């Protein structure tokens, strides 16, 4: 399991640990990842993802997982999140009323 957010693609960064005597040694800054269960209204089921705390705030701000995934850039999403996005788009297209030509 990689240390990468499934929604925002945040991953580890590299920097220095600096001692009192200013000696620099390499270290990794790991993202704050949580296993979170989101509710998808369009799919009608729960979805468990490994996301950063920043992504949790973004999902809440956008009004839920469905709205966030519809707005999200496909390049930043994991393969699992891309499958969810496509499934949500498909359900949304089915639910939308078909325009009648008159």
UniProtKB/Swiss-Prot annotation:
InterPro entries named among the record's database cross-references: Ribosomal_bL28, Ribosomal_bL28/bL31-like_sf, Ribosomal_bL28_bact-type, Ribosomal_bL28_sf
Single biological process term from Gene Ontology: translation
Coiled-coil annotated spans: none
Gene Ontology cellular component terms for the protein in this record: cytosolic large ribosomal subunit
Superkingdom of origin organism: Bacteria
Family annotation (Gene3D superfamilies): Ribosomal protein L28/L24
GO MF term list: structural constituent of ribosome
Keywords: Ribonucleoprotein, Ribosomal protein
Region entry Disordered, spans: 1-20
Record Pfam families: Ribosomal_L28
Alphabetized HAMAP family for the sequence: Ribosomal_bL28
Family to which this protein belongs: Belongs to the bacterial ribosomal protein bL28 family.
PANTHER family linked to this entry: 39S RIBOSOMAL PROTEIN L28, MITOCHONDRIAL (PTHR13528), LARGE RIBOSOMAL SUBUNIT PROTEIN BL28M (PTHR13528:SF2)
Protein name: Large ribosomal subunit protein bL28
Gene name as annotated: rpmB
């Amino acid at each position: 399991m990689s240390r990468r957010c499934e929604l925002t693609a945040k991953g580890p960064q590299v920097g220095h640990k600096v001692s009192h005597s200013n000696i620099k040694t390499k270290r990794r800054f790991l993202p704050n990842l949580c296993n979170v269960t989101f509710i998808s209204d369009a799919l009608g089921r729960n979805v468990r993802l490994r996301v950063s705390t920043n992504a949790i705030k973004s999902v809440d701000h956008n009004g839920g997982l469905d709205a966030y995934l519809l707005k999200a850039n496909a390049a930043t999403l994991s393969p699992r999140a891309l499958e969810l996005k496509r499934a949500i788009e498909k359900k949304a297209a089915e639910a939308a009323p078909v325009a009648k030509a008159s």
